[in-house]
Swiss-Prot record:
UniProt-listed Enzyme Commission number(s): 2.7.11.24
Domain notes: The TXY motif contains the threonine and tyrosine residues whose phosphorylation activates the MAP kinases.
Catalytic reaction annotation: L-seryl-[protein] + ATP = O-phospho-L-seryl-[protein] + ADP + H(+); L-threonyl-[protein] + ATP = O-phospho-L-threonyl-[protein] + ADP + H(+)
Protein name as it appears in the record: Mitogen-activated protein kinase homolog NTF3
Gene: NTF3
Species assigned in the record: Nicotiana tabacum
Expression (tissue specificity): Ubiquitous.
Sites of Phosphotyrosine modification: Y193
Length: 372
């Protein structure tokens, strides 16, 4: 449990209380009690809590020094802008963003999400038995959430087991939208924070300029294979090794299947790899349902133009017991996520402040009155 502490300057801010957790100060709204640490990483610290006003269990993520690294700050801003518009049962809900005390100098950001029990990475590496029904239900929910994102013109671009949150009912929600982009975006994909290599589509590994929703489908295929085999299907050590592992399993590609590679050096590299007949997925996953194997091999297709789409995957016979298109509406409007990658710290802070105000209409009204 977190330890209640006095504020660092001895002055309490109305509506806030203070906790120490893993040598970090949490300055949070008094409606959230108690708080208990549940995880930490490069992104910050996450704790569980209860909203006293709604009695709802939540996860509070504190992002320390949110503007110290510009790329991290842009990721946070992108997630805020996106999640404000998304409403789907297979996409994590951002419930609140705590109001900072000082508009022009706040450093930390507190995001409040619905609370989930674990993630798919933890489940895959556990000793828990995963039946065909489990695999089918997880895949169905992932595809459903992804169909909604793609209907909003959003590419997730970082799908992996650790970004799929699960609760005790086996409900699945997609999270971590810091790398998401609009599918029409012209920005540079290969930032210094690239998508986890093991789930990266061939067209990204080969630095192709034109990529689309099929990159997310490839990631889903990798995740599905990992569910079936309880280990990553393409655990590459670096980019070229990743491509070798893919060719070893899918087999050497025909000339027509590498026409999408617009980089001559990349195409030459693929053609230089030793011939591989490939390994059938039915041999890799002998206990998997035949329809699961059929769907998997339609998702893990080297040429993105021949890869199955999310809607086609949901209509596949393996998904038919679960999928009802009439209960699966698309997003209301496409979302524009284009953000200037060259924004400075102060501009990002101001844009983030504007996003936070969306969760606090009373503060937004007060700010307008001050301006007037």
């Amino acid at each position: 449990m977190a330890t209640p502490v006095e504020p660092p300057n001895g002055i309490r801010t109305p509506g806030k209380h203070y906790y120490s957790m893993w040598q970090s100060l949490f300055e949070i709204d008094t409606k959230y009690v108690p708080i208990k640490p549940i995880g930490r990483g490069a992104y910050g610290i996450v704790c569980s809590s209860v909203n006293r006003e709604t009695n709802e269990k939540v996860a509070i993520k504190k992002i320390n020094n949110a503007f110290e690294n510009r790329i991290d700050a842009l990721r946070t801003l992108r997630e805020l802008k996106l999640l404000r518009h998304l409403r789907h049962e297979n996409v994590i809900a951002l419930k609140d963003v705590m109001m900072p005390i000082h508009r022009r100098s706040f450093k930390d950001v507190y995001l409040v999400y619905e609370l989930m029990d674990t993630d798919l990475h933890q489940i895959i590496k556990s000793s828990q038995t995963l039946s065909n029904d489990h695999c089918q239900y997880f895949l169905f929910q992932l595809l459903r959430g992804l169909k909604y994102l793609h209907s909003a013109n959003i590419l997730h671009r970082d799908l992996k087991p650790g970004n799929l949150l699960i609760n005790a009912n086996c409900d699945l929600k997609i999270c971590d939208f810091g790398l998401a982009r609009t599918s029409s975006g012209k920005d540079q994909f290969m930032t210094e924070y690239v998508v986890t290599r093991w789930y990266r589509a061939p067209e990204l590994l080969l630095c192709c300029d034109n990529y689309g929703t099929s990159i997310d489908v490839w990631s889903v295929g990798c995740i599905f294979a990992e569910l079936l085999g309880r280990k990553p299907v393409f655990p590459g050590t670096e980019c070229l090794n990743q491509l070798k592992l893919i060719i070893n399993i899918l087999g050497s590609q025909r000339e027509e299947d590498i026409e999408f590679i617009d980089n001559p050096k990349a195409r030459k590299y693929i053609k230089s790899l030793p011939y591989s007949p490939g390994t059938p997925f039915s041999r890799l996953y002998p206990h998997a349902h035949p329809l699961a194997i059929d769907l998997l091999q339609r998702m893990l297709v080297f040429d993105p133009s021949k890869r199955i789409s999310v809607i086609e995957a949901l209509q596949h016979p393996y998904m038919s017991p679960l999928y009802d298109p009439n209960t699966d509406p698309p997003a209301q409007v496409p979302i524009n996520l284009d953000i200037d990658e060259d924004l400075g710290e102060e501009t990002i802070r101001e844009m983030m402040w504007s996003e936070i105000l969306e969760y606090h209409p009373e503060a937004a009204t007060a700010a307008m009155e001050v301006v007037l």
